[in-house]
Amino acid sequence: MESWLFLALVLLIAIFGHNSSLIIATVIVMVLKLIPYTAKWLPLIQHKGINWGVTVISVAILIPIATGQIGFNDLWAAFKTPAGWIAVGMGIAVAILSKYGVNQLAAVPQVTVALVLGTIIGVVAFKGIAAGPVIASGMTYCIVTLLNLHF
């Protein structure tokens, strides 16, 4: 019952915050909970969902290359500006943080609750996008390790 109340609260916050992505995600999870015998699916979705999401995002990022909107000239142009180098560096940093984030989420499940709360606040209150829990977990890992803190 507690999970239903929690999901209902998330749904209300998403509706109040006009966040369609969070509304859709919450409704999908609620529908999955209603379907008989999905108890074994939910851990699979939890475990593999991040990888599936990364795959979908990667497909969306590659579409402009496939349609010819972005070509080799654009790639070379990116290396001619400081902003391009910063973008490459941030891409590398995010990939590294994500690696630590996935490990952190697996090793310390308690961090998930705090990240979910922070993500919901960021999405609803600041009109952010719920695309960064793994990165946030990686950043958490780095700061917690640097400050020698523990959950």
Curated annotation (Swiss-Prot):
Species this chain originates from: Limosilactobacillus reuteri (strain DSM 20016)
Coarsely, its chief localization is membrane
Topological type in the membrane: Multi-pass membrane protein
Pfam families linked? DUF441 (PF04284)
Q: What residues form the membrane-spanning segments? A: 4-24, 52-72, 77-97, 115-135
Identification of the protein by name: UPF0756 membrane protein Lreu_0946
Q: Does the keyword Membrane apply?
A: yes
Concerning its family, UniProt says:
Belongs to the UPF0756 family.
User: May I have one GO cellular component term?
Assistant: plasma membrane
InterPro entries in the record: UPF0756_TM
> Mind listing the UniProt keywords for this protein, alphabetically?
Cell membrane, Membrane, Transmembrane, Transmembrane helix
Question: According to its UniProt record, where is this protein located?
Answer: Cell membrane
